[in-house]
Amino acid sequence: MRRKFLAFALSLVILCALVFELYPRSSQEIDLSTGAGISKMLRYENAQVYLFGEIHRCTEYQQFRNALFKYLVEKKGVRVLLMEHGYASGFLENETVQNRLSFSDEYGYDQFIVSKEDYELFRWMSEFNQNRPERDKISIVGIDITDSIGMVYAFCRYLLRDCDFSAADTKTQMLLISTQKCQFQQRFENSLLPQLIELYQTNPEQLELALGDQAIHLERVLQGWQQGQECYKLNDYQPDLQLDGPAVAYREDALYANLRRVYEENPTAKYFGSFGAAHVQMENYVQKEGSSRINNSFVSRMAGKNSFLDGRLTVIDGAITHEIRELGEADTNHLTLYNTALAKNPGSESGKFYAEAPDTPDEKIAQYVLLFEHPSQVTASEDQPGRYWKNYKEK
C-alpha cells in the first residue's frame, strides 16, 4: 500500500511539474549569449510567420535576433529569412549563405556595412546549409525597396557574369554584354540602367530569352529600383523618411505586396523577418504628432481579419525599453521577454506595455514585447564598412 501511495505521489509531482512547465509563461529572462529561455515562451506559438521589431544597429537587439532565429530554425522549422533590404541585397546575401559566393567575394559585400553579430548570423547560416538538401536549406529574401545604386550595379554584374545571351535579339545581346563588362558604376547608372529598365518595360520577352529562369531576378531588382526612386521623389528627395508623409505609405505598400508575393510563391514555408520596430505592430494605436510609429504599417495589414496571414502571424515588438529594475552596476544588460496576454508591464504605472494606447489591449498590438534591464545602456553595434567578411576573419 505504501509503495502504491509513493508511486501515486511521484506521478502527481511529475504531472504537476509538466503542467507548470508546459503552461504558457507570462515572462522569461533571455540569455543573449545562448538564447536560453526562448523555448519557454515561443514553443507555444505554431505560427508560420514570425516578425521581430528591432532598433536598428543596436548590439543587444542583434544578439536577440540571432538567438531567436536559430531557435526558430532548429525547433520550429523556419527556413526563410525576410530582410529589410532590397531584392538585390537579399539576392547576394542568399548566394553567400548558399555557399555560391564566398564571404570575401568581389560582388556585393564590399557595399555592405555590417556588424560582428551580422557576420556571426550569416556564417552560421552558411554552415547550416552545407551538405543539406535544397528543400532543407535556409534562404534569404529582401522585400524592401532600398537597394543603393552600388548594390544594383553589383547584382547585375554578378547575375550576368557567365550568361549566354545568344537566344535574344542583337540589341538585347549588346545591352547585356555591355552591362556584363561595365567597369564604371557611373556609366551603368547614367546609361545602361535606364536602357535595362526600358527593355524590361517594353520587351520583357527578350530578357526571358536571354536569361531564362534568371530573368525574374533582374526584373524584380529593376522594379524595386524604380519603386525606390518613386519613394525618394515622394519624400522630396530627402534621405530620412517623413513618418507622416506619402513616401512612408508608399514604402509600406511595397513591403506588404512583396511579402505577400514571397508567401504566395512558397505558402508552406515558415518565415522569420527582422524589421525596424516602427514597421512591426499588429494594430495602429498612436495618433500623436511626431510619433515614431507608422500609420497603417504593413504588419498591421497582415494581422487583420481575412488577411492572408490571419492566425498565422507572431509579432515580437522590441521597441519597448522601459526600465524594469533600478539601474545598477551590472555588466550584463538583461533582457526579459513578456507575453502581452498574460503579463503586466512592471515598469509603467498604468500596467500597460503600450501606455500610449489606453483603449487598445496590449496583445492586439504585439503578442510579445522585450524589456531591457538598463535601456539607457543598450549599445550601438560596431559597424564595419568595406570587406568586412575578410577583415573580420583576419582579426
For the regions a language model picked out, list residue spans one by one:
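N-terminal Sec-pathway targeting helices
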Residues: M1-L12
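Compositional signal for N-terminal targeting/processing segments
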Residues: A17-K395
